[in-house]
Every structure is written in C-alpha cells, then in structure tokens.
Amino acid sequence: MSNRKLAWTDAAWDDYLYWQSQDKKTLKRINKLIKATKSQPFEGIGKPEPLKENLSGFWSRRIDEANRLVYAVDDNYLTIIACRYHY
C-alpha cells in the first residue's frame, strides 16, 4: 500500500459529490480506481493512459464508457483532477 495522500481539485470534489447523490455503482467504481491508483498509478484496472498536449503530465483511467478519472501523481500525492465526463 502506498503512503500517497489523496488530494482533490474543487471541480473533482464536486464531481465526486455528484456521484454520491446520483449513482452509487459509479461511486464504488471510482473508489476502487482510486485505491488501485494510489499503489500502482501507471498500471492496473481502468486502462491507465498518459494524457497529451494541454493535459500532459496527467493520467486517465476509465470509470465507464462515458466518464474518466483524471489524476496527477507524485511521490507524496495522488491528486484527483476530475471524475466525471470525458476530458
């Protein structure tokens, strides 16, 4: 298990709160992706892929067909950038 701390952008936290009230199944999937990403940020479930161009430095994992978990990671933090919609 990683010692990375979890951080959220304001927009990502709003996305997360949306899922809490609208779709518990999607919320469970997001939580599962976050847990996996904390320990293995660049491989595993959700088909992790590095983003390009203006999103260079961020990574993405599939929540479902329409939504993505977008995040940045370093040695200390996993920062959730978005968890709703497709970048």
Q: What is the role of each PLM region?
A:
Residues 1-5, 11-28, 45, 51-52, ...:
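Enriched for short, Lys/Arg-rich terminal
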Residues 15, 33-36, 54:
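Residues that form generic nucleotide/phosphate-binding pockets
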Residues 27-40, 45:
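Compact soluble domain cores
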